[in-house]
Amino acid sequence: MWTLPLPDVVNVDSQLTTALTYINGDAVYALSSIERAAVLAVYQTYDTLLGQPGPSLIPNELAACRQHIREGYSQIQVGGRLASLRASLLASTDVCPYCGFGEPTELDHYLPKTQYDELAIYPRNLVPSCGPCNNAKRTVVPGMPGIPGLIHAYFQALPSVDFMRADVDFTDGALDVTFRIEAAELNPVLAAMLKFQL
Protein backbone atom coordinates (compact mmCIF):
# COMPACT_ATOMS: atom_id res chain seq x y z
CA MET A 1 0.00 0.00 0.00
CA TRP A 2 1.81 3.05 -1.20
CA THR A 3 1.53 5.95 -3.55
CA LEU A 4 2.81 6.63 -7.05
CA PRO A 5 3.95 9.81 -8.81
CA LEU A 6 1.25 11.54 -10.83
CA PRO A 7 1.24 10.44 -14.48
CA ASP A 8 1.94 13.14 -17.04
CA VAL A 9 -1.26 14.46 -18.61
CA VAL A 10 0.21 16.85 -21.16
CA ASN A 11 -1.05 14.63 -24.03
CA VAL A 12 -4.61 13.96 -22.80
CA ASP A 13 -6.21 15.98 -25.59
CA SER A 14 -4.38 14.06 -28.31
CA GLN A 15 -5.01 10.76 -26.46
CA LEU A 16 -8.72 11.58 -26.50
CA THR A 17 -8.56 12.17 -30.25
CA THR A 18 -6.63 8.93 -30.78
CA ALA A 19 -9.15 6.92 -28.76
CA LEU A 20 -12.01 8.32 -30.84
CA THR A 21 -10.38 7.98 -34.28
CA TYR A 22 -9.91 4.84 -36.35
CA ILE A 23 -6.42 4.10 -37.61
CA ASN A 24 -7.53 5.16 -41.13
CA GLY A 25 -8.41 8.61 -39.78
CA ASP A 26 -12.19 8.23 -39.73
CA ALA A 27 -13.89 9.35 -36.54
CA VAL A 28 -15.32 6.74 -34.17
CA TYR A 29 -17.13 9.72 -32.70
CA ALA A 30 -16.51 13.34 -33.66
CA LEU A 31 -16.41 15.36 -30.44
CA SER A 32 -17.88 18.82 -30.72
CA SER A 33 -15.79 21.68 -29.36
CA ILE A 34 -18.23 21.90 -26.43
CA GLU A 35 -17.84 18.18 -25.67
CA ARG A 36 -14.03 18.33 -25.94
CA ALA A 37 -13.91 21.31 -23.57
CA ALA A 38 -16.26 19.49 -21.17
CA VAL A 39 -14.07 16.34 -21.15
CA LEU A 40 -10.93 18.39 -20.48
CA ALA A 41 -12.80 20.25 -17.72
CA VAL A 42 -13.77 16.88 -16.17
CA TYR A 43 -10.08 15.93 -16.15
CA GLN A 44 -9.18 19.17 -14.36
CA THR A 45 -12.03 18.71 -11.88
CA TYR A 46 -10.90 15.14 -11.20
CA ASP A 47 -7.46 16.48 -10.27
CA THR A 48 -9.00 19.21 -8.11
CA LEU A 49 -11.14 16.61 -6.30
CA LEU A 50 -8.01 14.46 -5.85
CA GLY A 51 -9.68 11.62 -7.72
CA GLN A 52 -12.75 11.49 -5.51
CA PRO A 53 -16.27 11.21 -6.95
CA GLY A 54 -18.56 14.13 -7.52
CA PRO A 55 -21.50 15.14 -9.72
CA SER A 56 -19.33 17.62 -11.65
CA LEU A 57 -17.48 14.62 -13.13
CA ILE A 58 -20.62 13.62 -15.06
CA PRO A 59 -21.72 16.77 -16.92
CA ASN A 60 -24.85 16.72 -19.08
CA GLU A 61 -22.88 18.04 -22.07
CA LEU A 62 -21.26 14.62 -22.44
CA ALA A 63 -24.40 12.45 -22.57
CA ALA A 64 -24.01 11.69 -26.29
CA CYS A 65 -20.32 10.76 -26.18
CA ARG A 66 -20.00 8.93 -22.85
CA GLN A 67 -20.29 5.45 -24.32
CA HIS A 68 -17.74 6.24 -27.04
CA ILE A 69 -15.20 7.50 -24.52
CA ARG A 70 -15.72 4.43 -22.34
CA GLU A 71 -15.30 2.17 -25.38
CA GLY A 72 -12.12 4.10 -26.22
CA TYR A 73 -10.51 2.30 -23.29
CA SER A 74 -10.15 -0.72 -25.58
CA GLN A 75 -7.47 1.29 -27.43
CA ILE A 76 -5.33 1.25 -24.27
CA GLN A 77 -5.06 -2.53 -24.47
CA VAL A 78 -2.08 -4.30 -26.05
CA GLY A 79 -2.21 -3.67 -29.80
CA GLY A 80 -4.52 -0.67 -29.44
CA ARG A 81 -3.81 2.85 -30.66
CA LEU A 82 -3.03 3.93 -27.07
CA ALA A 83 -1.03 0.85 -26.05
CA SER A 84 1.95 3.10 -25.30
CA LEU A 85 -0.11 4.79 -22.55
CA ARG A 86 -0.76 1.39 -20.99
CA ALA A 87 2.91 0.47 -21.24
CA SER A 88 4.08 3.71 -19.60
CA LEU A 89 1.57 3.43 -16.74
CA LEU A 90 2.50 -0.19 -16.04
CA ALA A 91 6.22 0.65 -16.27
CA SER A 92 5.81 3.35 -13.61
CA THR A 93 5.99 0.79 -10.78
CA ASP A 94 7.18 -2.73 -10.07
CA VAL A 95 4.72 -3.33 -7.24
CA CYS A 96 0.94 -3.01 -6.98
CA PRO A 97 0.14 0.08 -4.88
CA TYR A 98 -2.96 -1.57 -3.41
CA CYS A 99 -1.30 -4.62 -1.83
CA GLY A 100 2.37 -3.66 -1.93
CA PHE A 101 3.68 -6.92 -3.39
CA GLY A 102 1.81 -8.08 -6.52
CA GLU A 103 3.17 -7.38 -10.00
CA PRO A 104 1.13 -4.71 -11.82
CA THR A 105 -0.23 -6.30 -14.98
CA GLU A 106 -3.58 -4.49 -15.22
CA LEU A 107 -4.93 -0.96 -15.06
CA ASP A 108 -7.59 -0.28 -12.44
CA HIS A 109 -10.10 2.49 -13.03
CA TYR A 110 -10.02 4.17 -9.62
CA LEU A 111 -13.45 5.61 -10.37
CA PRO A 112 -15.14 2.82 -12.37
CA LYS A 113 -15.64 3.47 -16.08
CA THR A 114 -19.13 1.99 -15.76
CA GLN A 115 -20.14 5.05 -13.74
CA TYR A 116 -17.56 7.62 -14.85
CA ASP A 117 -17.28 6.97 -18.59
CA GLU A 118 -15.56 10.33 -19.13
CA LEU A 119 -12.56 9.12 -17.11
CA ALA A 120 -12.13 5.78 -18.90
CA ILE A 121 -8.90 6.84 -20.62
CA TYR A 122 -7.68 9.56 -18.23
CA PRO A 123 -4.20 8.47 -17.06
CA ARG A 124 -4.71 9.68 -13.49
CA ASN A 125 -7.78 7.47 -13.14
CA LEU A 126 -5.82 4.42 -14.36
CA VAL A 127 -3.84 2.84 -11.53
CA PRO A 128 -1.37 0.02 -12.29
CA SER A 129 -2.42 -2.95 -10.18
CA CYS A 130 -2.02 -6.68 -9.87
CA GLY A 131 -4.83 -8.90 -11.14
CA PRO A 132 -6.08 -10.01 -7.70
CA CYS A 133 -6.34 -6.42 -6.42
CA ASN A 134 -8.03 -5.17 -9.59
CA ASN A 135 -10.49 -8.05 -9.40
CA ALA A 136 -11.17 -7.50 -5.68
CA LYS A 137 -11.74 -3.78 -6.15
CA ARG A 138 -13.85 -3.98 -9.31
CA THR A 139 -16.51 -1.29 -8.95
CA VAL A 140 -15.77 -0.05 -5.44
CA VAL A 141 -16.39 3.69 -5.55
CA PRO A 142 -15.02 5.91 -2.78
CA GLY A 143 -17.80 7.39 -0.72
CA MET A 144 -20.26 4.53 -1.25
CA PRO A 145 -22.40 4.12 1.88
CA GLY A 146 -20.71 1.76 4.31
CA ILE A 147 -17.61 1.32 2.13
CA PRO A 148 -14.66 3.63 2.78
CA GLY A 149 -12.93 2.72 -0.48
CA LEU A 150 -9.24 2.47 -1.24
CA ILE A 151 -6.50 5.05 -1.04
CA HIS A 152 -5.83 6.80 -4.35
CA ALA A 153 -2.31 5.83 -5.37
CA TYR A 154 -1.75 9.15 -7.15
CA PHE A 155 -3.43 11.62 -4.80
CA GLN A 156 -3.43 10.17 -1.27
CA ALA A 157 -0.94 11.70 1.14
CA LEU A 158 0.17 9.07 3.63
CA PRO A 159 1.53 10.11 7.03
CA SER A 160 5.16 9.51 7.88
CA VAL A 161 4.31 7.23 10.80
CA ASP A 162 4.44 3.46 10.91
CA PHE A 163 0.78 2.47 10.72
CA MET A 164 0.97 -1.11 9.48
CA ARG A 165 1.67 -3.81 12.04
CA ALA A 166 2.31 -7.53 11.70
CA ASP A 167 1.39 -9.90 14.50
CA VAL A 168 3.37 -13.14 14.24
CA ASP A 169 2.35 -16.33 16.03
CA PHE A 170 3.65 -19.86 15.86
CA THR A 171 0.73 -22.18 16.51
CA ASP A 172 0.58 -25.95 16.06
CA GLY A 173 3.78 -25.96 14.02
CA ALA A 174 2.60 -23.25 11.64
CA LEU A 175 3.60 -19.65 11.29
CA ASP A 176 0.60 -17.31 11.38
CA VAL A 177 1.06 -13.68 10.35
CA THR A 178 -1.78 -11.21 10.71
CA PHE A 179 -1.52 -7.66 9.42
CA ARG A 180 -3.43 -4.74 10.93
CA ILE A 181 -3.57 -0.97 10.76
CA GLU A 182 -2.59 0.93 13.90
CA ALA A 183 -5.08 3.75 13.68
CA ALA A 184 -4.20 5.79 16.79
CA GLU A 185 -2.15 8.41 14.95
CA LEU A 186 -4.19 8.42 11.73
CA ASN A 187 -7.08 10.52 10.50
CA PRO A 188 -10.19 8.33 11.05
CA VAL A 189 -11.21 8.49 7.37
CA LEU A 190 -7.73 7.46 6.22
CA ALA A 191 -7.59 4.73 8.87
CA ALA A 192 -10.92 3.31 7.62
CA MET A 193 -9.66 3.33 4.02
CA LEU A 194 -6.42 1.58 4.96
CA LYS A 195 -8.27 -1.04 7.02
CA PHE A 196 -10.67 -1.65 4.14
CA GLN A 197 -7.78 -1.96 1.70
CA LEU A 198 -5.88 -4.36 3.94
Please place each PLM-identified region on the residue numbering:
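Short cysteine-rich loop/turn motifs with clustered Cys
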Residues: 85-106, 130
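N-terminal accessory alpha/beta regions
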Residues: 2-82
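Mixed-charge, polar/low-complexity N-terminal
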Residues: 71, 77-80, 86, 92, ...
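Short, intrinsically disordered, charge-biased short linear motifs at domain edges
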Residues: 80-87, 114-119
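Glycine- and acidic-residue-rich phosphate-binding/metal-coordinating active-site segment common to enzymes
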Residues: 104-186
